[in-house]
């Protein structure tokens, strides 16, 4: 009896929502404080996943990324539902990591049971800055007092590689010393992965100043034992992100959700960015697809 070789892919679930204003990422994101809307979005994504499962039966998922915005804004039970659905409808490698871009406030007693049941392996905390004077411009909360509970109580990051940080660089109102302080704070904590996100919009520093911050971060992170495995992405040895590595090395990407980009069999397919269209027709490939072009054309 012949054994069918499965096609290795990585998977992304796109959650283009933010938990705060403003956003510094330069993409169009939706302020996600409407619980009913977020639940409808999850149901729509579930329909899209089910509708495409049969056509992707020859694929094996090597890594899953929950991103595109603050994915943790979705209710923990809804995320658990989606991941259970994926594992029941798709071939998922036994050791496939599941990583999530996370607002620190969502690491709490209400969500963690669902996150643990979903087998999330790393939480990329959107801290943006660890300099106390910058919290007023970068966030609505100062998480300093909560970090011990997040780090040791919920994530147990000191005993497992479960915590990453997202830091913002290249912002006008954050001094070079403030950014340096943030990076040094990272090196003192049980962090296994760092994503450096450049500030976008009116507060963006010029290219030279932003690059100077990036260069300084590279030096500090290298001295602390981190390895740069992709632009602006750093990890402790062995903790490199399999989703980003796979995508960067040309592995096909299955993506679901609003504005998602799927790369498969030499083609890139783009989902609609219209929320109402997606909510109403997520299971209909033709209704939610806005473009299908060869990879070379898209690049």
Predicted features along the sequence, with ranges:
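Long, contiguous juxta-domain segments that are non-catalytic but functionally important
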Residues: 1-3
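Local cysteine-cluster metal-coordination motifs and their immediate loop/turn environment
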Residues: 16-29
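C-terminal scaffold of the Radical SAM
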Residues: 6-10, 27-54, 59-299
């Amino acid at each position: 009896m012949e054994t069918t070789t499965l096609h290795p892919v990585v998977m992304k679930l796109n959650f283009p929502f933010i938990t705060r204003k403003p956003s510094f990422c330069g993409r169009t994101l939706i302020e996600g404080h409407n619980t009913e809307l977020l639940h409808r979005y999850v149901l729509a994504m579930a329909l899209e996943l089910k509708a495409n499962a049969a056509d992707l039966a020859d694929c094996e998922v090597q890594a899953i990324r929950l991103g595109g915005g603050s994915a943790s804004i979705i209710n923990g039970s809804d995320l658990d539902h989606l991941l259970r659905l994926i594992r029941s409808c798709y071939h998922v490698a036994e050791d496939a990591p599941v990583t999530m871009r996370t607002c620190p406030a969502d690491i709490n007693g209400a969500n963690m049971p669902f996150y643990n049941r979903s087998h999330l392996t790393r939480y990329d905390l959107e801290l943006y800055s660890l300099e106390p004077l910058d919290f007023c411009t970068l966030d609505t909360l100062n998480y300093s007092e909560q970090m011990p509970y997040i780090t040791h109580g919920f994530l147990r990051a000191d005993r497992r590689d479960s915590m990453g940080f997202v830091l913002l660089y290249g912002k006008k109102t954050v001094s070079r010393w403030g950014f340096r302080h943030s990076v040094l704070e990272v090196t003192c904590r049980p962090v296994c992965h760092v994503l450096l996100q450049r500030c976008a919009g009116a507060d963006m520093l010029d290219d030279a100043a932003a690059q100077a911050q990036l260069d300084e971060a590279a030096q500090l992170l290298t001295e602390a034992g981190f390895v740069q495995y992709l632009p602006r992405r750093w990890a402790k040895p062995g903790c490199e992100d399999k989703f980003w590595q796979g995508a960067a090395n040309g592995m096909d990407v299955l993506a679901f959700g609003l504005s998602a980009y799927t790369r498969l069999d030499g083609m890139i397919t783009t989902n609609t960015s219209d929320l109402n269209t997606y909510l109403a027709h997520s299971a209909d490939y033709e209704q939610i697809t806005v473009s299908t072009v060869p990879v070379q054309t898209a690049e």
